[in-house]
Amino acid sequence: AALAIDLNIGLDRNKVRGALEDTRLANDMYTDAHARLMITRGTKVKPFQHPSLSLSGPTMVIIMEHSKALSARPIRLSTVPHMRGLPMTQDPKLNSHSKLNCVLACIAAEKAGADEALMLDINGFVNTTNACNFFIVRNGTVWTSTGDYCMNGITRQKVIDVCRENNISVKEKNFSLVETYGATEAFVTGTFGAQTPVREIDGRIIGDKDLGPVTEKI
């Protein structure tokens, strides 16, 4: 991602790993540590866009904290008009600080009384939430979006791998809101949320219990 946006971090991969390890050890963290790595272009002489105005070169911030198991409380989603960016505008596969569309989606969902926003892609198919990847279960098969218009998260891929390794049918495909409303199970995935069940979408109850059998098996 840094190479794609012409950002020279000034450190190779091993040195970045070393900085993460140094931060972990400095905080006496040995298990279940979560590292958030953020890199900017550094301090600027003026608050303008051009990268050449940076005075100090890249700034790297490492926030190290212990991951805590989140409640298994199922969440509510609300569909919003905001979409993830397109590759020619703001590629959703770039994990950048500039995610105003996701922030606006989050605000819209909150105002609708939901926990997260369900976002569609440019073709009207179900894509992702404002912060997590999204899955449904229909007829025992796990569905998630094609991944063309969302961040293909590590936990998302782990769920797909677990399904394939355990003979659980899984598909990366286009699917509609109507198909989503008819799902028997739904869940979201993310680094902190891991695998969180979804109980309600746009006021429609999904499934007949909080944690469906396929979700529980995964």
Model region roles, listed by residue range:
Residues 155-157:
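Secondary-structure junction motif
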Residues 1-118, 122-125, 151, 160-218:
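Conserved alpha/beta cores of soluble small-molecule-handling proteins
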Residues 118, 125-147, 152:
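Glycine- and Gly-Pro-enriched alpha-helical subdomains that act as flexible
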